[in-house]
Amino acid sequence: MARIGDGGDLLKCSFCGKSQKQVKKLIAGPGVYICDECIDLCNEIIEEELADADDVKLDELPKPAEIRDFLENYVIGQDTAKKTLAVAVYNHYKRIQAGDKARDARGETVELAKSNILMLGPTGCGKTYLAQTLAKMLNVPFAIADATALTEAGYVGEDVENILLKLIQAADYDVKRAETGIIYIDEVDKIARKSENPSITRDVSGEGVQQALLKILEGTQASVPPQGGRKHPHQEFIQIDTTNVLFIVAGAFAGLEKIVSDRVGKRGLGFGAEVKSKADIDTTDHFAEVMPEDLIKFGLIPEFIGRLPIVASVTNLDRESLIKILSEPKNALVKQYTRLFEMDGVELEFSQDALEAIADQAIHRGTGARGLRAIMEEVLQPVMYDIPSRDDVAKVVVTGETVIDNVLPTIVPRKPSRTERRDKSA
């Protein structure tokens, strides 16, 4: 117990024995005292124990095959992209658990560098959804940012640090947790510079943004304004280390297929070359053959490409895939709308030709999987307006004719109960 020292009336810490003159603060309890230094030490011990408890052990980290199987439950097709992402994500979090360092067979320390991901492919093919599903499986903070809203520091628009603020907000302002999250930057093809040659004028929303993103992609200690917006000198900043943040950068890259085609086509010159028509070549096949030189020609700077070593490409969804997307995944659209109708006590049914017609419309509109919900809304909107006000409907059946000819779905009336028949006859 803390007592008055022999040399005078000085109080002492009950834990370390230091007098009140040797410490900044001495806090009194019932018969005991504790100094500020002992409090700090206790806090450090508690934080270390909590961190150890929160860390996912290596044997608990899902293996690439398990990650791919999980994605299969939610995303139809894109098998190559799933495997690429599964391996990349597994290696990324394995690296974090090793503390950025690992020892080889000779006991020497090996630095493990971060590998961010570049996703290429047409709109509506599942790029964003793949990243969202990954974050959901791993239970890590996830943030989506739009590259088109970003500008170089000092110009009207968002600073790149605002991307990090979204991640911190997704982690409920737990910075330590945010530092192992995933950031998905969409529409990155829209920040390509106008020419593959460096510009002498400022390109504040193109090359300037790429330059600004370099540091956070690679890993840096960033200062983030807690309320967003521009930085100003009287504002306190949140410090976040992006070394262990996984960046998935994506875009449709319209026009890149021509650059790849021109490069690949040069190999086929000469009398013995195989001649292919444009109809024989699927544009999405070209994304699988993308090289850094193609991305530089498109308008990405070499330093930016160098920080995105893993390339995953998604392909256009065919008719069969779109039909599967409507009904097979765990949260398929048909299942979602069926549940909505069940809440009103009505059964909803889609015929096979209705699903085929919805898929055909999505292909015709060129919207991919993203357009399926809009078509479903158009088809079901009249009955969704009418059904809640009625109690005589048992079932709604959507057929191919409903989708193609824009006619109302078939409504199956509910048979009156015995009590209702008795009341009516009375």
Swiss-Prot record:
<dbReference type="Pfam" id="PF10431">
    <property type="entry name" value="ClpB_D2-small"/>
</dbReference>
<keyword id="KW-0143">Chaperone</keyword>
<feature type="binding site">
    <location>
        <position position="35"/>
    </location>
    <ligand>
        <name>Zn(2+)</name>
    </ligand>
</feature>
<comment type="similarity">
    <text>Belongs to the ClpX chaperone family.</text>
</comment>
<dbReference type="GO" id="GO:0008270">
    <property type="term" value="F:zinc ion binding"/>
</dbReference>
<dbReference type="InterPro" id="IPR019489">
    <property type="entry name" value="Clp_ATPase_C"/>
</dbReference>
<protein>
    <recommendedName>
        <fullName>ATP-dependent Clp protease ATP-binding subunit ClpX</fullName>
    </recommendedName>
</protein>
<keyword id="KW-0862">Zinc</keyword>
<dbReference type="GO" id="GO:0005524">
    <property type="term" value="F:ATP binding"/>
</dbReference>
<dbReference type="GO" id="GO:0051082">
    <property type="term" value="F:unfolded protein binding"/>
</dbReference>
<dbReference type="InterPro" id="IPR046425">
    <property type="entry name" value="ClpX_bact"/>
</dbReference>
<dbReference type="InterPro" id="IPR050052">
    <property type="entry name" value="ATP-dep_Clp_protease_ClpX"/>
</dbReference>
<dbReference type="InterPro" id="IPR003593">
    <property type="entry name" value="AAA+_ATPase"/>
</dbReference>
<dbReference type="InterPro" id="IPR003959">
    <property type="entry name" value="ATPase_AAA_core"/>
</dbReference>
<feature type="binding site">
    <location>
        <begin position="122"/>
        <end position="129"/>
    </location>
    <ligand>
        <name>ATP</name>
    </ligand>
</feature>
<dbReference type="GO" id="GO:0140662">
    <property type="term" value="F:ATP-dependent protein folding chaperone"/>
</dbReference>
<keyword id="KW-0547">Nucleotide-binding</keyword>
<dbReference type="Pfam" id="PF06689">
    <property type="entry name" value="zf-C4_ClpX"/>
</dbReference>
<feature type="domain" description="ClpX-type ZB">
    <location>
        <begin position="1"/>
        <end position="54"/>
    </location>
</feature>
<dbReference type="InterPro" id="IPR027417">
    <property type="entry name" value="P-loop_NTPase"/>
</dbReference>
<dbReference type="InterPro" id="IPR038366">
    <property type="entry name" value="Znf_CppX_C4_sf"/>
</dbReference>
<keyword id="KW-0067">ATP-binding</keyword>
<keyword id="KW-0479">Metal-binding</keyword>
<feature type="binding site">
    <location>
        <position position="38"/>
    </location>
    <ligand>
        <name>Zn(2+)</name>
    </ligand>
</feature>
<dbReference type="GO" id="GO:0051603">
    <property type="term" value="P:proteolysis involved in protein catabolic process"/>
</dbReference>
<dbReference type="GO" id="GO:0016887">
    <property type="term" value="F:ATP hydrolysis activity"/>
</dbReference>
<feature type="binding site">
    <location>
        <position position="13"/>
    </location>
    <ligand>
        <name>Zn(2+)</name>
    </ligand>
</feature>
<comment type="subunit">
    <text>Component of the ClpX-ClpP complex. Forms a hexameric ring that, in the presence of ATP, binds to fourteen ClpP subunits assembled into a disk-like structure with a central cavity, resembling the structure of eukaryotic proteasomes.</text>
</comment>
<dbReference type="GO" id="GO:0046983">
    <property type="term" value="F:protein dimerization activity"/>
</dbReference>
<feature type="binding site">
    <location>
        <position position="16"/>
    </location>
    <ligand>
        <name>Zn(2+)</name>
    </ligand>
</feature>
<dbReference type="GO" id="GO:0009376">
    <property type="term" value="C:HslUV protease complex"/>
</dbReference>
<dbReference type="GO" id="GO:0051301">
    <property type="term" value="P:cell division"/>
</dbReference>
<comment type="function">
    <text>ATP-dependent specificity component of the Clp protease. It directs the protease to specific substrates. Can perform chaperone functions in the absence of ClpP.</text>
</comment>
<dbReference type="Pfam" id="PF07724">
    <property type="entry name" value="AAA_2"/>
</dbReference>
<dbReference type="InterPro" id="IPR010603">
    <property type="entry name" value="Znf_CppX_C4"/>
</dbReference>
<dbReference type="InterPro" id="IPR004487">
    <property type="entry name" value="Clp_protease_ATP-bd_su_ClpX"/>
</dbReference>
